[in-house]
Amino acid sequence: MSNAEAIQVSSLPLPPAQYINLYTDENIRKNRAPKPPAPIQDAYTMFGSPFSNDDNIIRPLESQGFKRLYPQHFDRRKELKKLNHSLLVNFLDLIDLLVHYPDSPRRAEKIEDLSLLFVHIHHLLNEFRPHQARETLRVMMELQKRQRIETAQRFQNHLEKVREMVKNAFASLPDLTDADRLAGGLEPMDVGESGDLAGGRGEGCHPLDRLMCELVDRM
């Protein structure tokens, strides 16, 4: 093997071994894969910070120890633009300090200002998450509704085709007029009280009846 061959190295870490060994296709098909953990009812820890189910999804900045830079009632789009401009200005100020006064104590202040601006930007973006979740749910439900309407329409089209096929099948059946005519041509015979045929076997007998009687006599 040549040493010049490139060694392929994945830029992503390998998947966890427990998922490979436990959640195989065979285990899932045989219902042997472990069940997902039950929902957490009480407090839990995420990224080293304690949380509770009773807490708000988006906690206020004051409860997290940050100073609020905008009022309680505001336009989020306008404030995000202002924070973005402030972030750019403070970043340029930090670059200017690093170039001209690298040992200035204002460098730490600018870094703190940048951190606070980033926190506020992320907080405003996170406040859009509930709206994003509702909008995602609305779009998903509209998609499901459209798919079900299309499925119902396809069923209706198939039903119309089946009805048309049944109608054509009935229309292609043979006409029963000849059979009805043949059945109507056989007149019923009158039977007297003694059980004999009315008129005997004389001229009043139907030709077909006479033919049938002759066939029976020959047997």
Swiss-Prot record:
Pfam family, one: Med7
UniProt keyword annotations, A-Z: Activator, Nucleus, Transcription, Transcription regulation
GO annotations of cellular component type: core mediator complex; mediator complex
InterPro entries: Med7/Med21-like, Mediatior_Med7, Mediatior_Med7_sf
Family named by the database record: Belongs to the Mediator complex subunit 7 family.
Function, as annotated: Component of the Mediator complex, a coactivator involved in the regulated transcription of nearly all RNA polymerase II-dependent genes. Mediator functions as a bridge to convey information from gene-specific regulatory proteins to the basal RNA polymerase II transcription machinery. Mediator is recruited to promoters by direct interactions with regulatory proteins and serves as a scaffold for the assembly of a functional preinitiation complex with RNA polymerase II and the general transcription factors.
Name of this chain's protein: Mediator of RNA polymerase II transcription subunit 7
Top-level taxonomy: Eukaryota, Metazoa, Ecdysozoa, Arthropoda, Hexapoda
Underlying gene: MED7
